[in-house]
Amino acid sequence: MSGIDPKRFGKVAVLFGGESAEREVSLTSGRLVLQGLRDAGVDAHPFDPAERPLSALKDEGFVRAFNALHGGYGENGQIQGALDFYGIRYTGSGVLGSALGLDKFRTKLVWQQTGVPTPPFETVMRGDDLAARATDIVAKLGLPLFVKPASEGSSVAVLKVKTADALPAALAEAATHDKIVIVEKSIEGGGEYTACIAGDLDLPLIKIVPAGEFYDYHAKYVADDTQYLIPCGLPAEQEAELKRIARRAFAVLGCTDWGRADFMLDAAGNAYFLEVNTAPGMTDHSLPPKAARAVGIGYSELVVKVLSLTLND
């Protein structure tokens, strides 16, 4: 596909592991990315920032990094800033796009100001009177609701709440993961979709049909009964328009090159964007490899394409 001489990439670090709640997912992603790059002839090496100082990247002559870290400092702009400081090119978004992309609260604020549709929501701060806030939120948003920490990925600590009585406990659980908790109106009727973005590749939308209540951590990385529908079943014109909106939702946050934008459709077919992911999972359960495979792009070819985006000015 790319016709790129792998020697152009130089010495490449595959960053994976880290110290976030998503460490295990990152370890799986990183090992597969490493193998995919090596299969293509890239001089790629494993690098876990939880075990080695980042300064070793410069000391050991790395010129490029494939970021397979998920959550925490790997996705919130910190690693990106350090790599900028060391002059090492890296996959995915820069400091601003990464920081905003991991912060669901500020993502939604930007979307509200730029016309990207997103579900109505309220925020709860750690230390708030949870019972009082729960009563107020149910009155404003109704039920069911989704409760999620503002800055965790992979659906860590995301809970669906169907009754008012269950909301305070869900808020308390989410607040153990983040000082800001998002409470979002559940969009029902049309299903959940993701748009995978990888440079100029035209990847199909994926409709996600979990066997359980929603697409949680277990459905993403453990269960084998989640259905991923490609093609997604939408009319071609609607799919093209949703992909256009997804790219805009990604771009207005300052996100670049590669990632995902997740959204729900209501019963009338209206889209509501939930979040972006600037360092998507690359496990055998993950969505970008599935979307690429559907259009004839294998795993190794996909990771080389993503890495090739670091060659652009």
From Swiss-Prot:
Its cofactor is Mg(2+); Mn(2+). Belongs to the D-alanine--D-alanine ligase family. Pathway: Cell wall biogenesis; peptidoglycan biosynthesis. GO terms for cellular component: cytosol. Its main location: cytoplasm. It holds the Pfam family Dala_Dala_lig_C. It catalyses: 2 D-alanine + ATP = D-alanyl-D-alanine + ADP + phosphate + H(+). Keywords: ATP-binding, Cell shape, Cell wall biogenesis/degradation, Cytoplasm, Ligase, Magnesium, Manganese, Metal-binding, Nucleotide-binding, Peptidoglycan synthesis. PANTHER family: D-ALANINE--D-ALANINE LIGASE, D-ALANINE--D-ALANINE LIGASE B. Its EC number is 6.3.2.4. Mg(2+) 1 binds at D262, E275. It is found in: Cytoplasm. The lineage of its organism: Bacteria, Pseudomonadati, Pseudomonadota, Betaproteobacteria, Burkholderiales. The gene is ddl. Binds 2 magnesium or manganese ions per subunit. ATP binds at residues 138-193. Residues 108-308 form the ATP-grasp domain. Cell wall formation. This is D-alanine--D-alanine ligase. It comes from the Bacteria.
